[in-house]
Structures are given as C-alpha cells and as structure tokens.
Amino acid sequence: MISVELPLKRTKLVQAYHRWFADKPLASDSYKLVYHYHCKHLGPLKGVTRERKFTKLLDISIDEDKLMAAFGKTTRYEVRRAGNSDELQFGLVSNWETFLKYYNGFAALKEMPEMDPTILRSYWPHCVVTEACFEGQPLVMHTYVVDPVASRINLTYSATHFRGEVDRELRRKQGRANCWLHHQDMLHFKREGYACYDFGGYAFETTDKSLQAVNEFKDSFGGELVEESNYTSRALGWLRWVKSLR
C-alpha cells in the first residue's frame, strides 16, 4: 500500500490522504479524510462508503513473447509497425513541471480541467512518467502510480498532443505511438521487477460510445477484468456534503 498526503488549502491542522492498493481500509480511517483506491475487499465496511471499481490487469511477469501474443492482432501490428518504422524513442520524464505543462496543454485541447500542481507534487514520489518521442518531441506521455511492495503499476493519466489537426498521418503515428508506448511501459516495468500492469479503470457495462471505445482499446491488450473497491471515509464524505451545501 502507498499513502499520499495531500495538503488542504484552508488549514494545515488537518491532512487528507489518498491510499492505494490496500486490502481494505483501517477502522481508524473512518475518522480521517481518506480516499482508498483499488482495495481488494469487495463488501461494505463500517465507517466508509464503497464504490465498485473495475479495471483490467495484465501479468507482465510472463515471457515477453507470451505477453505480446495476448494482444489482439491489430494491436500487435500497430506495436510492431511503430517499433520498426516510426522512429520512436522511449523515455522517462524526471521533472514534474515538464509533465504538468504537457498535460495541461492536452487538457486545454480537450477542454478538460488543468491538473493541480500541488496534488501532482504530492504524488510525484510515487509516480513514473514515460514518453514516446518523435524527432525529439513527445507524442504521448503516460503517468503511473507505482507500488513496489504490491508489485503493481496503475495507469493514471495518458496525454497526447495533436500537432496540426489536418495532418492525418501524424494522428495515425500518434495512435501507433500510444500502443507502442503501452508495450514499452510493460517491458520497462517488467525489467524493474513489477508483475501487475493496471490499466487504471474500466467502464463496466457502459452505454457511452466513447467509453466503450476506450474499453475496446484496453481489451486489445488482453489481461483480466477484475472488480475492486474504492472507499470514501465517513469524515471525507461528510466534508464533501458540507461543501455541496455552499
């Protein structure tokens, strides 16, 4: 399990926490501002509110050829073509401000909220950011929350910049780069000794077409669909309720 301490804007007397990959919340967590991600326990618990969480998990400890063989035919083709023809370079992003700038540029294109730099700084010791570059410029970045003890990595953010919306070939190259980067990430973390690659979520039984497309993309890498639990502590739920009244 990892625990991320989040500073509150209005007071330093109380801290909020995000905890990841615990079996289940501690009883004492109900009196703290705690949100638990990806717990193994599947039932209700006293002092916390449960939310069902689905995700796709891949065993990356297996042989590399078997890992690739589990991919769908199209995904294998995209990964191989990108690796053989697209002149991509794999890299790690060591500076959180570099990722923040890239992600916020992506968010602006998608009309999404910008990332909070305070939260990113708190998470950074538990994050690994990878990139696929072409001619020295990043086409795709992936951010992972990593837990060495659990031997698990969780895809938290994926960001892509479309340089020139009319350039269809570049769009196709970026699509291949995204597939390729997922594969390179798996190989990188495998070499680092991790065993479980977590796609970060799965929109179970969704009727939303765009979310269905995301599910299909994740399905194309194989893996197992699993149910887990996110839990909100009683204290955090109460605080959110108070804020909703304002």
Residues of each region from the PLM?
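A conserved beta-strand-loop-helix scaffold within acyl/acetyltransferase catalytic domains
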Residues: I2-P7, H36-E51, T55-D63, L67-L170, ...
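Conserved acetyl-CoA-binding loop-helix of GNAT-fold acetyltransferases
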Residues: E165-F189
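Conserved acyl-CoA
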Residues: F21-S30, W180-C196
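N-terminal accessory interaction module
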Residues: M1-P44
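C-terminal catalytic domain of photolyase/cryptochrome flavoproteins
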Residues: D198-R246
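Active-site-proximal structural scaffolding
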Residues: P125, G175-N178, L211
